[in-house]
Amino acid sequence: MSDSPNEITIDNSVLVLIDHQPWVAFSVKSIDAGLLVNNLAGIAASARALDVPIILTTVGAEGGGLKDPLINGITEVLPDVTPIDRVSTNAWEDIRPAVEATGRRTLLIAGLWTEVCLAQTAVSAIAEGYRVFFISDCSGGMSDEAHEDAKARLELLRRDGPTAAAFTFRAPFPAPGGSRSSQPVADDWFCPT
């Protein structure tokens, strides 16, 4: 497969979902909560079906007063993926070893809050030479303006990316050899009957 700087493939990408926890989501105003959960479950299921490595993070879930797990939509699809818990807003230092272990240099990042944890992590990864694509409809800010401003900053770095459905539909149907196809996932999450 091609691996050009503008190409996102199932073989060169890592999905990074940052802090999709109920207490963080409570203050998100830039996307409907139900839509956010649906999109997250859909992209997580797509990545799983396509064998794309997945890295999850939480903030303050262990040892903090909040002890807040991930949103149910994620844990239902990825019950065996253990989140990396941290205490700082920039997840990059904590997730870098997991990203490096995949051997992949393209990150598909979604997170809460867009303007804080997601933006800081994306900028740090870009500074280290990673290609970063922001998944807008699996992310949320504390206001529409904050979310849009963060998107604009990332777009200035020319690293804006797909929506959850666009990532799902990029996979070949059926996949070569019939082994990896996200068509059933796309049908379940993005084309409900």
Predicted stretch roles:
Residues 2-14, 50, 61-193:
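Active-site-adjacent betaalpha module
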Residues 11-13, 28-56:
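A short alpha/beta connector and helix-capping loop motif
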Residues 14-21:
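Short acidic catalytic loops
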Residues 20, 56-59, 136:
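A cross-domain feature marking catalytic cores of carbohydrate-active enzymes
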Residues 21-27:
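Short acidic, Gly/Ser-rich segments with clustered Asp/Glu that frequently serve as metal-coordination loops
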